[in-house]
Design a protein with these regions (language model features):
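Structured alpha/beta or helical-core interaction and ligand-binding surfaces enriched in interleaved
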Residues: 1-126
Length: 126
């Protein structure tokens, strides 16, 4: 199933079926500061935090018209993978990743993002 994302009334882009942005976030104070930073950068309502089952680590889900990301806690609880797909050209994907990374930098959240294009890392942030 291919997800269709509308970026403007006259332009339709397809969100990739595989991830094209791979990230890692260090969150010693939990995921709430990450949610706040993401919503500040991308707008309210596009990020949710939930527990998938009792006793499981919290998960962040980011959904916009052009992006779909989800976190995965790594052993130890402070480090989280934050991978997802962004629709659009290579430049659009890089711009989205830069925007998210800038929000993390501003919030003093340690992170890394790799933007992948054609199977190769095209950009590493910050």
């Amino acid at each position: 199933m291919v997800m269709i994302a509308t970026t403007s009334p006259d332009r339709i882009t397809r969100r990739p079926q595989t991830n094209n942005v791979y990230g890692q976030i260090v969150a010693p104070d939990g995921l709430r500061p990450v949610v706040v930073a993401l919503e500040k950068a991308l707008g309210p309502g596009c990020v949710s935090m939930f527990n998938p089952r009792p006793g499981a680590p919290e998960v962040i889900r980011l959904r916009t018209d052009v992006a779909d990301f989800e976190s995965l806690a790594l052993p130890g609880g402070m480090d989280h993978l934050f991978n997802g797909s962004v629709a659009g050209s290579a430049e659009d994907v890089a711009a989205f990743a830069r925007r998210v990374s800038a929000a993390m930098v501003e919030a003093k959240i340690e992170h890394t993002f790799d933007v992948v294009n054609a199977g190769r890392v095209a950009l590493t942030l910050p």
